[in-house]
Amino acid sequence: MDGCGTYLDTMRREAPLVQCITNFVAMNVVANVLLAAGASPAMVHDAEESGEFAAIAQALTINMGTPSPRWVEGMEAAARGAAAAGRPWVLDPVAVGATAFRRGLGARLLALKPTVIRGNASEILALAGAETRGKGADSADPVAAAEAAAQRLAESSGAVVAVTGPVDFVTDGRRGIRCANGHPLMPRVTALGCSLTGIVGAFAATRPPFEATAAALAFFGLAGEEAAKTATGPGSFQVAFLDALHTLSPEALDRGARLEAA
């Protein structure tokens, strides 16, 4: 693939409109992360308009963090709208294995053909129908334990699958890439995983999904590394992280991205 900086440069030049159906905890954080990176967020979730809006946006992201029947209607309408308009959409199957309600929702959204699926190891294992030790939205499984399931899920769904953790794994069922960028402070700030899904959507709006997803993970992780250089804890890290997303240059991303073929 081209240098990751090329993907960042394209995303910033095009400033894609990304429709984000995310959870109550994450909404403000996701919007600020996308704005800092150079995209344009729209938090449009109600079924009355979500499907219509998905045809206007350049990408859609759906996060299952706090589902309710009305929000589920909006998710499904948006996914159908994105598919009909040929727009990429990203599924974040938060805690998909935790309850029967979430398992059913995950299966229905998967049937609507996401372009990219981004989750932690336990979520990807559960979505693929494999045994998992996940606890709620947190992963109790290592990324390596989900790599084979991710490949099977990519093959069966046609989606690019990203398993995120200390070292991320991305596959389209044929190819694989690992990304080692990131910092231990990142999981100490709520909604950064949800925000990563938004960034993947922004990158996938402008470039092919496999390469765009890998570049998005490297960008997000490297911004975390840069933010940690000045942060003294999770609070200052969150502010520094937004600044790093805004200031990180394509050239710096090319130098700092730690990607390798898997």
Swiss-Prot record:
Keywords: ATP-binding, Kinase, Magnesium, Metal-binding, Nucleotide-binding, Thiamine biosynthesis, Transferase. Its EC number is 2.7.1.50. One of its GO terms (biological process) is thiamine diphosphate biosynthetic process. ATP binds at residues 118, 164. Its cofactor is Mg(2+). Pathway: Cofactor biosynthesis; thiamine diphosphate biosynthesis; 4-methyl-5-(2-phosphoethyl)-thiazole from 5-(2-hydroxyethyl)-4-methylthiazole: step 1/1. Pfam families: HK. Substrate binds at residues 43, 191. It catalyses: 5-(2-hydroxyethyl)-4-methylthiazole + ATP = 4-methyl-5-(2-phosphooxyethyl)-thiazole + ADP + H(+). Catalyzes the phosphorylation of the hydroxyl group of 4-methyl-5-beta-hydroxyethylthiazole (THZ). NCBIfam families: PRK09355.1, thiM. HAMAP family: Thz_kinase (MF_00228). Belongs to the Thz kinase family. This is Hydroxyethylthiazole kinase.
